[in-house]
Amino acid sequence: MGRLCTKFLTSVGCLILLLVTGSGSIKVLGEPTCFSDYIRTSTCEWFLDSAVDCSSQLCLHYRLMFFEFSENLTCIPRNSASTVCVCHMEMNRPVQSDRYQMELWAEHRQLWQGSFSPSGNVKPLAPDNLTLHTNVSDEWLLTWNNLYPSNNLLYKDLISMVNISREDNPAEFIVYNVTYKEPRLSFPINILMSGVYYTARVRVRSQILTGTWSEWSPSITWYNHFQLPLIQRLPLGVTISCLCIPLFCLFCYFSITKIKKIWWDQIPTPARSPLVAIIIQDAQVPLWDKQTRSQESTKYPHWKTCLDKLLPCLLKHRVKKKTDFPKAAPTKSLQSPGKAGWCPMEVSRTVLWPENVSVSVVRCMELFEAPVQNVEEEEDEIVKEDLSMSPENSGGCGFQESQADIMARLTENLFSDLLEAENGGLGQSALAESCSPLPSGSGQASVSWACLPMGPSEEATCQVTEQPSHPGPLSGSPAQSAPTLACTQVPLVLADNPAYRSFSDCCSPAPNPGELAPEQQQADHLEEEEPPSPADPHSSGPPMQPVESWEQILHMSVLQHGAAAGSTPAPAGGYQEFVQAVKQGAAQDPGVPGVRPSGDPGYKAFSSLLSSNGIRGDTAAAGTDDGHGGYKPFQNPVPNQSPSSVPLFTFGLDTELSPSPLNSDPPKSPPECLGLELGLKGGDWVKAPPPADQVPKPFGDDLGFGIVYSSLTCHLCGHLKQHHSQEEGGQSPIVASPGCGCCYDDRSPSLGSLSGALESCPEGIPPEANLMSAPKTPSNLSGEGKGPGHSPVPSQTTEVPVGALGIAVS
């Protein structure tokens, strides 16, 4: 029995030893941390150096210090972790002045001792009932509950912190501090990303009392979704549009192509109908600018061709701009000044008409600028273009009348009718009508005719005046004037040879003293009808140039003799006429050398030629009018036969134009209806030729005088052959022509000798003859005329002084 008591005492001793050994080994790491919720509970927490069972080994004793008789309160801690002990102490309605004394015991050993004030260490309670409201249209509303009563100090002293973060990425969050009293937070929906899950939580803290943030409230989660604004949807819309528009265009292209191939191409179109005809003329372009079809097709883009096929009804044909030729400046077209110039352009269109309508012509013209040429090529091109501007080569351009020309012709006809009625009514009004100018073969010069009544017998004479070609309009066309008026053509006289002279009219009798000269009567009539106006550009001409030599005086005498041959008696012979002309010229101007009555060795062969002329005149008197002196061009022996060949001794210069349908007399035309035109150049008065019935017959007296003229005239220089003897060395100097040896005086006669040599005038024109003004043509232009039987020679306008009658034809 004693043995049992010994075993019990040994066991109790070991237990006490273990307890003492164990209690001495617990150690607190630092001071405990205490904080209060300032409503009912204060919490203390401390850390130990080793794992300890807090509830069995440790004990916390605390008591209120301000009351002397306050009781000690004990708190049993618990383990929050293996080395962390937490103890929750109950406090009844704490105030700011409360202070507690605290002691930590490990069995019978004190581990820590200190004090704690609840108002200095406040940790508010975590909010609860966190809610998100979505009933607001554009904002989120987040609410929570305040756990402090209204009588508590922390009810109005708490601030809140709201944390909103993505559920999938908590590091991306947004924090809102709520400083107002109400436990709520409102934020816009679009501040968060749409289509994302978000979580929210809240914690509070006292603003007045010292303390820390409360624990986080339980979190809530929601799905954020809203309609994006337009500015945020614009990039997406632009991207989608950039992708959809090309796809749509491609779809439309292939769809329209498919539909056109299946449906549109199967519909009959007027373009394939036989009722349509298109005649395209070749483009009038230079050869170097013409392009082949392959070159033109390469310049037309392929996409335009496809567009033409897709939308044929919406496309219009192209019209090219007007272009001018580079040679338009030196070569001007012959057109009316009152009308705009004809400019070709490309006109390409389709014409529809019924089957019974004639085919229309669509003219397609294209102009290309010629490349730059040198000076010689430009001169050759100008010559070619001048030749191509003739009526035959103009290609339908033609000469057109302008309104001004038509009015001028009507005015002339009106004045002619009035003058005829005033002078006793000279038969028919056709005598006053002016014949249209007959264009020459080259289109560069024209001959104008005028009707000139000749006294009571109503005979008419013809005068031809040169009308050089110019860019202005012509007075008419041959097709209009030839059938209506009968124009008798006087033998043409070429005005290019200064040695072409006549002296037969020097023997004509002088007019009576009381009677005016025929040229003065004509001048009076012309002044009454149409006084020249200095402002009129048609009536005014270039200033008169004085006659340069006595040979021109002789030439005008020939013209006067041809005009007065029908009314004056025939002279005895050509040599006597020449002597009288020379005497008269020497008497009026004795200072002119080379003009002597007789004895000039240059005319010794003249009398022998006159003898043959007299014999021929006797033999030919049966068929012709004898006694007409002066040299005239050759005429056909038979009027209705073709003209004979040109004699060799005339050098092709002194023959008349062969009759043609344009200038021949129509059948059954009375001589009094001959259409003539009086040509006035530079204000000079021109005498009319003799009447048609007094004109000498062909080959009456012309052959002999032609031989005389050919013998006396040098065909190289155009002057009379004068070979002076040795005794003439003391007279005025004589100039020898280069290349032929003919001598001629280099001094020109004075104006007095010129007018004196022309005093004798024919009496064939009666004083009462009425004159009408010819259509006015510009006198500053010259042309080049060609006629059958004549070689082309440059035309020269002969300047005729006042009182002289001249016929100048180019």
Swiss-Prot record:
TM region(s), chain numbering: 234-257
Membrane-side (Extracellular) residue stretches: 26-233
Keyword Phosphoprotein belongs to the record: yes
Compositional bias per record (Low complexity), positions renumbered to this chain: 635-647
Record note on modification: On IL4 binding, phosphorylated on C-terminal tyrosine residues.
Residue ranges of the motif Box 1 motif: 263-271
Chain residue ranges for the region called Required for IL4-induced gene expression: 557-653
Residues modified by glycosylation: N72, N129, N135, N163
Cystine connections: C34-C44, C75-C87
PROSITE patterns: FN3, HEMATOPO_REC_S_F1
Residues with Phosphotyrosine modification: Y500, Y575, Y603, Y631
Annotated tissue distribution: Expressed in both Th1 and Th2 cells.
Record localization: Cell membrane
GO-annotated biological processes: defense response to protozoan; immunoglobulin mediated immune response; negative regulation of T-helper 1 cell differentiation; positive regulation of chemokine production; positive regulation of cold-induced thermogenesis; positive regulation of immunoglobulin production; positive regulation of macrophage activation; positive regulation of mast cell degranulation
Domain of life: Eukaryota
Molecular function terms from GO: interleukin-4 receptor activity
Subunit text: The functional IL4 receptor is formed by initial binding of IL4 to IL4R. Subsequent recruitment to the complex of the common gamma chain, in immune cells, creates a type I receptor and, in non-immune cells, of IL13RA1 forms a type II receptor. IL4R can also interact with the IL13/IL13RA1 complex to form a similar type II receptor. Interacts with the SH2-containing phosphatases, PTPN6/SHIP1, PTPN11/SHIP2 and INPP5D/SHIP. Interacts with JAK3. Interacts with PIK3C3. Interacts with JAK1 through a Box 1-containing region; inhibited by SOCS5. Interacts with SOCS5; inhibits IL4 signaling.
Family (UniProt): Belongs to the type I cytokine receptor family. Type 4 subfamily.
Protein name as catalogued: Interleukin-4 receptor subunit alpha
Record organism: Mus musculus
